[in-house]
Every structure is written in structure tokens, then in C-alpha cells.
Amino acid sequence: ALHDLVNYDTGLYYVRFTPFSFFEFTFRETLLKTQHSVKKTWNYYQQDRSSTIRVRPLAEREGKWWPSVVIGVNDIYSAYGASFYAGYYGVATKHFQLGDGQIALTAGYFRSIKSGKMYNGAFGGVEYCPLQRVPLRIMADYDTKGVNIGVGYTLFRHIRTFAFTHRLKGWGVGLSYRTTIKF
């Protein structure tokens, strides 16, 4: 079933810019094989370009009870198109030591700007790092529509790899490179 491995429905690429520890901007493009338009680009029929702006008004402090709080908005402007990610959200995350590892609990709420789009409602997740010196992450979350489970591993401090199930029906893999540009 090599055909099944390469006959995927979507693709995604993104660029994330974090000029300050409390501010982040992301541009993403999702490629879909749905036939909503006539022009076919890169073997896809539809592209959804979107951006995200996130601010963190409250940072988590080690040894204190309060979580990190982030508020954000996705795809705030769209002249036309799908706007799959359009909405705003608030999220809180708290990390706890668990033996030699660490666990992070996240809860939030996403409000879709356009009804019937990608996400709408409460979401949450858990991430477990069994050993702090080993860059392995085991994750599970609920994304307002279903449960996702995944693993991630960081190579050479910059290359992140991951594999996950999508609502326990399909699967995905990914690769990203993270670096800090010094000025």
C-alpha cells in the first residue's frame, strides 16, 4: 500500500517569528486536495493561507501555582477563501515535575469567527517528558473535535520530529527546524 502512504489529503508549511519571549507571529499555508477551485497547484486544488498573532500576558513561574496564559487570534483578515483557522483563543499551561520527568497540562477555549470551520469550543492536552535529559515527548490532546495522540523527539537541539494520530482515524508525521537568530 505504497499508494496509501503517498496519497495524503493535506500538506502544511509554516514560518514562526518570535521577536520577544511574550510575542509570536506565524504564517501558515495549508494545502488541500478538495476540489473547491479550478486551478491545481502542486497537485492540490485549494490553499488556505493564514496567520496567527499570540501574546503571553502571564508567564509561568517555577514553584508558583499560576500557569502561563496565552491569548491569540488566527486569520484575522481574509479577503476571500476558506479561512479554516479563523478565530480567537485563550489558553493556560502549567508544568509539573514528575519523578525524573515533567508533565505539562494545557486547557483553553477557541471561538471560531466563521461557523462550521476547523475548531470551536474547549480544548486541552497533556505532554509528558519521561526524562528531562532525553528530548522525547509523549502527547495527547482534545482539539474540540477529537482526540489526537503523538510522540516527538528533538535531534541536535534544533531538529524536531514528530508522529501523531489525527482523531485516531489517520496519522501524520512532521519535521521542523528551530533556531535563534542573534542580533
Regions found by a protein language model. Give the residues of each.
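Transmembrane beta-barrel domains of Gram-negative outer membranes and organellar outer membranes
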Residues: A1-Y80, F84, H95-L98, F110, ...
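Outer-membrane beta-barrel transmembrane domain signature
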Residues: H3-N7, G81, Y85-R157, I181-F183
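Flexible, glycine-rich linker and terminal segments associated
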Residues: R160, H166, G170-F183
